[in-house]
Amino acid sequence: MRDETPEQPAPLRFGYTTGSCATATSLAAARLLLAGQADDAVEIVLPKGQRVMMRLEFCRATADGAEAGTIKDAGDDPDVTHGALIFARVALAAAPGVRFHAGPGVGTVTRAGLMLPVGEPAINPVPRQMMTTHLEALAAEHGYAGGFDVTIGVEGGEMLALKTMNPRLGIVGGLSILGTTGIVRPFSCSAYIASIHQGIDVARANGIAHIAACTGNASEDAMRAHYQLPDMALIEMGDFAGAVLKHLRRAPVARLSMCGGFGKLSKLAAGHLDLHSRHSSIDLPLLAQWAAEAGANDALQAAMRAANTSQEALKLAQADGVPLGDLVCAHALRVARDIVPPSVVIEMFAIDRQGRFVGVAR
């Protein structure tokens, strides 16, 4: 008899951050310089104490030091750097300590508000600490009293960076070297949420008092046209409305405009802070209830509950003169108001699929 037990999906694979890759390659290059040992794999210790072995593509001497490279494996996370070659070039220096430099494909910070000063290579604090810890331990092991100049690069990083928020954050010339745990967790979205927080921080540090958080390109275009806001004021929040609102609780601005498609805004209005379809759905009966409170008759309510999409429910309400878009924005505003400090002026905008405003609340 045929076994009809459904096949269990394989668990999603974890991967390693660019910070882990930079640590492994810088350690391998430095070991070649101090011990004459060219490895094809190297063990590193992650910030939480796990030991992992990372395979190297090369480890070789150069005219002024040594270099090593590894292929970034992000596991099953849809990471823009997955499969990229990340490399470190290390040179010994008389002065003690570790100094970091941006190689090809790694960006440089040009705006205030990030975790690094303007002019520094975009190598975040945790990866810097990881590399420093490993290199200092290696130096102690070999009785080396000097320092290290470490240059980190990403092959093709200049082009890959265009797919990230780095250009808007003022990180020019390439990618950032990231990571807080050393591990990439599949679909954790932590990097995206971090970029939202960074976008807000950069705006604040550069004197932007009014930011617009947008779910996508159409809503961003609508906000740009409506307010003539600079790119620095436009925050690509995607589905992560909660990431914006909760960060503003800690780092407020004077004014927040949130703009999204009507369906996305209806999820926020219902109290959902993650607007992705995996985590929230559109509540048509709730939309019908709100329409009823604005005077919708029984027939319209029934039609809205039976609608196939939120857009269909919106059109039905509009045809009957019920301002459903404004109602949804008003409820979304209440949700945001409960999270964001009262000093922040908030307004909500909903757009249709053509990018036209179909609702507003202030």
Swiss-Prot record:
InterPro entries per UniProt: CbiD, CbiD_sf
Organism: Burkholderia orbicola (strain MC0-3)
HAMAP family documented for this protein: CbiD
The protein's name in its UniProt record: Cobalt-precorrin-5B C(1)-methyltransferase
Domain of life the protein comes from: Bacteria
Known pathway: Cofactor biosynthesis; adenosylcobalamin biosynthesis; cob(II)yrinate a,c-diamide from sirohydrochlorin (anaerobic route): step 6/10
Substrates-to-products reaction catalysed: Co-precorrin-5B + S-adenosyl-L-methionine = Co-precorrin-6A + S-adenosyl-L-homocysteine
Protein family: Belongs to the CbiD family.
BP terms from Gene Ontology: anaerobic cobalamin biosynthetic process; methylation
Pfam families registered for this protein in UniProt: CbiD
EC nos: 2.1.1.195
Keywords: Cobalamin biosynthesis, Methyltransferase, S-adenosyl-L-methionine, Transferase
NCBIfam families for the chain: cbiD, PRK00075.1-1
Molecular-function annotations in GO: cobalt-precorrin-5B C1-methyltransferase activity
Enzyme's top EC category: transferase
